[in-house]
């Protein structure tokens, strides 16, 4: 089992650092899946038990100048590692304006992901800063629990408003209630609602648009104004919104009525799926 990779392009390095910061905000620990052409950051808490799930995917060729890996075997050419997200994020913070970044799987009395950052000093000579991030290698028999989540057909799929705006609305609502209802329809309308014994607050977003597939065949006989809704823990939604550092190129919200909400974001060449289950 081997893995080594190198980034020398400054824009790629900054983008990779931003992704790492986002993951650290979304998950305390995560699984890093390394395959020949992709990297995935995975969080697979069981939705049925009220946990959130995350699947973040990036094509390695869009980031790395060098990328070599050998999986656990020829037929299972993948590596699954568990790590503390904050440790990776902290290591990459030192990589701003770096000349190069190297990541390597090592064993220093315990398995590590070793991050080496080549920095230019004032005298133009370079110095290397190294971080050893402790990891756990996940055995093959547990991989089946770490596959891409199956997305059920949504009742409504809708484009999200500007995430910054949505975040500031949800932050205010969190001061009133821990629970939130997200509802949306096929007419481009999305509402965020909280209800307590004393107060009921709703924020309306209109003309957001629905992706083409959502309006065709399966929904032809549906009333486009009919709302699908899901009742969720507001803190889980806020954690997701707080993790978004940049407004994505595409942001979709898929609602499975009274079961779950699935957010599907595309940041340039990085996709992020995030699942929040309904409160039982």
Swiss-Prot record:
Q: Which SUPFAM superfamilies match?
A: DNA clamp (SSF55979)
Give the primary localization class: nucleus
Q: Which GO terms describe its cellular component?
A: checkpoint clamp complex; cytosol; nucleolus; nucleoplasm; nucleus; site of double-strand break
* One example of a Gene Ontology biological process annotation: DNA repair
Keywords attached to this Swiss-Prot or TrEMBL record, sorted alphabetically, are: Cytoplasm, DNA damage, Nucleus
Against InterPro entries, the record matches this protein to: Cell_cycle_HUS1 (IPR016580), DNA_clamp_sf (IPR046938), Hus1/Mec3 (IPR007150)
- Pfam families, A to Z: Hus1
* Tissue expression pattern: Ubiquitous.
Q: Can you say where in the cell this protein is located?
A: Nucleus; Cytoplasm, Cytosol
Query: Key word Membrane present in the record?
Result: no
Q: Which PANTHER family would you find in this protein's record?
A: CHECKPOINT PROTEIN HUS1 (PTHR12900:SF4), MITOTIC AND DNA DAMAGE CHECKPOINT PROTEIN HUS1 (PTHR12900)
Cited function: Component of the 9-1-1 cell-cycle checkpoint response complex that plays a major role in DNA repair. The 9-1-1 complex is recruited to DNA lesion upon damage by the RAD17-replication factor C (RFC) clamp loader complex. Acts then as a sliding clamp platform on DNA for several proteins involved in long-patch base excision repair (LP-BER).
Subunit annotation: Component of the toroidal 9-1-1 (RAD9-RAD1-HUS1) complex, composed of RAD9A, RAD1 and HUS1. The 9-1-1 complex associates with LIG1, POLB, FEN1, RAD17, HDAC1, RPA1 and RPA2. The 9-1-1 complex associates with the RAD17-RFC complex. HUS1 interacts with POLB, HDAC1, FEN1, PCNA and RAD9B. HUS1 does not interact with RAD17. Interacts with DNAJC7.
Q: Which family does it belong to?
A: Belongs to the HUS1 family.
- Tell me what this protein is called: Checkpoint protein HUS1
State the organism of origin: Homo sapiens (Human)
Tell me the lineage of the source organism.
Answer: Eukaryota, Metazoa, Chordata, Craniata, Vertebrata
